[in-house]
């Protein structure tokens, strides 16, 4: 197939263009990804941020949502008519957010599998003898007896039920051997 007629020029690099500003402006103009899934699914891209949040029953500006009372000016009963509230068209968003906020928070901090195995090995082989644990060949990081004791205490604090089950299993093993 023949080529389309016309001038074909190679692309020239625009030296006078500020790439940093160009990228910054492109990032600023690009719509951000909304992290909250409830808000993201109810979002209407044809409307402004203020309109979207008003439809969901959320406030864009917290200062305007809950205005502070003026101390000096006392309004008369005639002036204190209820302001017409914006119509909340998507109340399920607020309900979902409230339900999610009422859930208990997950424990984010856990111990590494290596540390758990290390503590279990040391207690299984040496019991409460921290000096023997410090001399053990599996003590790769050359922890002192106090450091080992602290690691064991951390394990006890993080996993109390597992620790109790582990100690019970050790005692049952000792009884079988005796």
Swiss-Prot record:
List, alphabetically, the InterPro entries matched: Ribosome_biogenesis_Nop16
| Ranges where the record places region Disordered | 1-30
Does this entry carry the keyword Ubl conjugation?
A: yes
Q: Tell me where in or outside the cell this protein is found.
A: Nucleus, Nucleolus
Positions modified as N6-acetyllysine?
A: 90
Q: Can you locate the Glycyl lysine isopeptide (Lys-Gly) (interchain with G-Cter in SUMO2) cross-link?
A: 74
Q: In the UniProt record, which is one GO cellular component term?
A: nucleoplasm
A Pfam family of this chain: Nop16
Mutation effect (residue 71 to R) = In strain: NOD
Top-rank taxon, per record = Eukaryota
**Keyword annotations from UniProtKB, A to Z:** Acetylation, Isopeptide bond, Nucleus, Phosphoprotein, Ubl conjugation
PTM Phosphothreonine: list the residues: 8, 144
The family note in this entry says: Belongs to the NOP16 family.
Q: What is this protein called?
A: Nucleolar protein 16
